[in-house]
């Protein structure tokens, strides 16, 4: 059996780039909660003792940007300079302007267009991917890397590993077998965890705790064997972290946000963007389409692409590829996709209920936008698809 290795990585909620994603989405949530028609393009950057939010926002809401920044940093665990940032003492800079009137007239006609008439907020192409190798219909390498990161945060916050600090990264290499286009995981080849820690803990204690409290609960035993390689804090020291260790910026973890290097990516980030930005809503609808194709048994693995022009409601193109795993020809699956999914931005917003505020988008901004078991992730709902199974 010929196999190959594939690797996916993830980062924790305390990674500087992910901190920025979460602040941008916390701002978006606050805007949508007060005004569901808010138009938001919110970027965040951070470095030692400083967080800046900037971008274009048009909203009827009264938004306390500084409070959102400080609350988000505090909830992650940035409560002192020792851990990389002090939520209550850091400088918060705000530079927000309104959405360009040129964009507004082209996309939503200054709020005069009906939902089916609303154009895409920009040009671009987005991809959705699904695979039958996990219950989440997501790649195993990505699922494990993401769950290791989430588990690191869990054992930090519940006190199991009190030496942990917010920043950290994970990476998992999986050995795969290609079964006529479908991906079959054989074993976990390598596990890498680099986590921020305090001064009091030894490297041996770090390794022991990570194996017992992080790796063991996350990675199924069937994938681990005596040949599995573990790199646990291989640099030897990771005390300085968060924005003190590295600058952070919204939108720099787009592969971690999606499929861990599998499938494809159009390049547009998600966080801080309202649903008229097809970088986000378009990527969500094609994930639902790809997942529904696989979950309905039409294929074992699938990628869907959609593309847009600014101001134009209808997509320019829709593409489906099942990597040779389709039960019927891809052109037939494409017809089914077009019949069952409305790719117009205004209709995607309604069908996926994307204007709701609360902390909905904040939840997406760490540990992945896809494969999550949460009712707020409406794009993860499998649509029933009718199709004729070919006669044997």
Swiss-Prot record:
Binding positions for Mg(2+) per the UniProt entry: 9
Secretion signal span: none
Any one GO CC term of the record: cytosol
Cofactor binding remark: Binds 2 divalent ions per subunit. The metal ions interact primarily with the substrate. Can utilize magnesium, manganese or cobalt (in vitro). Binds 1 potassium ion per subunit. The potassium ion interacts primarily with the substrate.
Pfam families: S-AdoMet_synt_C (PF02773), S-AdoMet_synt_M (PF02772), S-AdoMet_synt_N (PF00438)
Superkingdom per UniProt: Eukaryota
Ligand binding (L-methionine): 56, 99, 246, 277
Entry's localization field: Cytoplasm
Cofactor(s) in the UniProt record: Mn(2+); Mg(2+); Co(2+); K(+)
Cross-referenced InterPro entries: ADOMET_SYNTHASE_CS, S-AdoMet_synt_C, S-AdoMet_synt_central, S-AdoMet_synt_N, S-AdoMet_synthetase, S-AdoMet_synthetase_sfam
MF (Gene Ontology): ATP binding; metal ion binding; methionine adenosyltransferase activity
Residues reported in the UniProt entry to bind ATP: 15, 167-169, 235-238, 246, 252-253, 269, 273, 277
GO biological process, one term: one-carbon metabolic process
UniProt entry keywords in alphabetical sequence: ATP-binding, Cobalt, Cytoplasm, Magnesium, Metal-binding, Nucleotide-binding, One-carbon metabolism, Potassium, Transferase
Function statement: Catalyzes the formation of S-adenosylmethionine from methionine and ATP. The reaction comprises two steps that are both catalyzed by the same enzyme: formation of S-adenosylmethionine (AdoMet) and triphosphate, and subsequent hydrolysis of the triphosphate.
Protein name: S-adenosylmethionine synthase 1
Organism for this UniProt entry: Populus trichocarpa (Western balsam poplar)
Protein's gene: METK1
């Amino acid at each position: 059996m010929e196999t190959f290795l594939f690797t996916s990585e993830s980062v924790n909620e305390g990674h500087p780039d992910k901190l920025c994603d979460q602040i941008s989405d916390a701002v978006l949530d606050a805007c949508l909660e007060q005004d569901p028609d808010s138009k938001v393009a919110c970027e965040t950057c951070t470095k030692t003792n400083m967080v800046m939010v900037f971008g274009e926002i048009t909203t009827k809401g009264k938004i306390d940007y500084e409070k959102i920044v400080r609350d988000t940093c505090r909830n992650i665990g940035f409560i002192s300079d020792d851990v990389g940032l002090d939520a209550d003492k850091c400088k918060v800079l705000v530079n927000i302007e309104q959405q360009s009137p040129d964009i507004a007239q082209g996309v939503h006609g200054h709020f005069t267009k009906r939902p089916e008439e609303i154009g895409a907020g920009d040009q671009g192409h987005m991809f959705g991917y699904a695979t039958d190798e996990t219950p989440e219909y997501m790649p195993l390498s990505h699922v494990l890397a993401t769950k290791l990161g989430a588990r690191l945060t869990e054992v930090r916050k519940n006190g199991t590993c009190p030496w942990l600090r917010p920043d950290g990264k994970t990476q998992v290499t999986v050995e795969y077998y290609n079964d006529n286009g479908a991906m079959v995981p054989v074993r976990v080849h390598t596990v890498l965890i680099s986590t921020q820690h305090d001064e009091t803990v030894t490297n041996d204690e770090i390794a022991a705790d990570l194996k017992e409290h992080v790796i063991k609960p996350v990675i199924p035993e069937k994938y681990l064997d005596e040949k599995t390689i573990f790199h646990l804090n291989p640099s030897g020291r990771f005390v300085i972290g968060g924005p003190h260790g590295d600058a952070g910026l919204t939108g720099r973890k787009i592969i971690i946000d999606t499929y861990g290097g599998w499938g494809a990516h159009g390049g547009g980030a998600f966080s801080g963007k309202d649903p008229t930005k097809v970088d986000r809503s378009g990527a969500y609808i094609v994930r639902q389409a790809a997942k529904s194709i696989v979950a309905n048994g039409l294929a074992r693995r699938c990628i869907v692409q959609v593309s847009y022009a600014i101001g134009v409601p209808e997509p320019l193109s829709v593409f489906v590829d099942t990597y040779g795993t389709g039960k019927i020809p891809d052109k037939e699956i494409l017809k089914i996709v077009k019949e069952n999914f409305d790719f117009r931005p205004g209709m995607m917003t309604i069908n996926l209920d994307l204007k709701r505020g609360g902390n909905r988008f904040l939840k997406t901004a760490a540990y992945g936008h896809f494969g999550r078991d949460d009712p707020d992730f409406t794009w993860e709902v499998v649509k029933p698809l009718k199709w004729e199974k070919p006669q044997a």
